[in-house]
Swiss-Prot record:
Gene3D superfamilies per record: NusB-like (1.10.940.10)
Transcription listed as a keyword: yes
Name of this chain's protein: Transcription antitermination protein NusB
Any single Gene Ontology cellular-component annotation: cytosol
Lineage, top ranks: Bacteria, Pseudomonadati, Thermodesulfobacteriota, Desulfuromonadia, Geobacterales
HAMAP family xrefs: NusB (MF_00073)
Assigned protein family: Belongs to the NusB family.
Family annotation (Pfam families): NusB
GO molecular function terms listed in the Swiss-Prot or TrEMBL record: RNA binding
Coiled coil: none
Function, in words: Involved in transcription antitermination. Required for transcription of ribosomal RNA (rRNA) genes. Binds specifically to the boxA antiterminator sequence of the ribosomal RNA (rrn) operons.
Amino acid sequence: MSSRREGRELALQALYSSDAESLGGTFALKKIMDNFADGSEPSLDVHGRSFTFATELVNGVLSNSEAIDRKIEEKSKNWSIARMAKVDLNILRLAVFELFYRPDIPKNVTINEAIEVAKKFGAEDSPAFINGILDEIASSLPDKE
């Protein structure tokens, strides 16, 4: 698994934990990383690029949460944010952050990664739901260079 995919998965877990336990995002991420630091997940890069990328994503989503949620709300037909599953919402938040604030990551990569994370962590219909909203959002953006 790529370090960016791993970072996205860690960031999702931190944002979900932050929502569920009313923790700060960075604290939630550190708590998750501490759980893996015991070596129970030897393939996990707890101190390297995965953690750095996850931290950047969590901080970026939290710093821009109002704008990100507004973008999601605008493009999610018949779905308010309050009705969305928390896993799906946080996957969308991560992807929208990448689409708007990470010009170095191509739109199609962001969307594909979000779908793959949704397959692993979401419900059966999560990948299609996330794909639909992200396609709507991405279609309104200029192509990244």
